[in-house]
Amino acid sequence: YEQMEPVLGLLDEIGYEALECWGGATYDSCLRFLNEDPWERLRKLKSNLKNTPLQMLLRGQNLLGYKHYSDDVVEAFCNAAVKNGIDRIRIFDALNDPRNMEAAIKYSKKAGAHVQSAMVYTISPVHTTESFLKVAETLVEMGTDSLCIKDMSGLLGPADAYDLVSTFKNRFGELPIDLHSHFTCGLASTTYWEAA
């Protein structure tokens, strides 16, 4: 946290829609490598970022771990995350199975968070624009506030990004659609350009 603190004021003035700063591996890293309390880190971030909503990454029914947790644990965790400073929760399931996201969506919304449901992008014969649309439709029915195409491997090319985003915009109208990509394969810049 100490390395981040000096720039938090500057980050807060930029005007980000949200700042993803918690969840995923950051929670684990605090405990395993940094000897930090991840909850205390979150509270410190919130106290220094007054104008910028804080976002976290949540692995659906797995929360921040590597196994499924019961619904009552999911509810308690989502409540605690919002109480300690999280405003937006980006929820995903590595298998793109909405059933593994349903409880987290329900309890995050109940706690007052903006819920962004993310679909994990990959390339295979079964991962088509139509299959992603089917997952997105289920997530919208569950009450998500926005959608995200999560390309954590950097595999999404410009043409496919254009097709996916266009299809989602045509189907869901004004529902916000985010694209999250990594530069692993060198495609992200052009992919963002085409998606926009």
Predicted regions and their residues:
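Active-site/ligand-binding-proximal alpha/beta "capping" segment
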Residues: 157-173, 177
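A short, small-residue-rich loop immediately preceding and capping a beta-strand
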Residues: 89-93, 175-181
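Active-site beta->alpha loop and helix N-cap motifs at the rims of alpha/beta catalytic domains
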Residues: 18, 23-140, 144-146, 154-158
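Catalytic cores of alpha/beta
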Residues: 130-135, 139, 185-196
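Generic hydrophobic/aromatic pocket-lining and core-packing "Φ" positions
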Residues: 8, 78, 105, 136, ...
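Glycine-rich phosphate-binding active-site loops on the catalytic face of alpha/beta enzymes
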Residues: 91, 151, 196
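Acidic/polar, glycine-rich intrinsically disordered N-terminal extensions of enzymes
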Residues: 1-19, 23-28
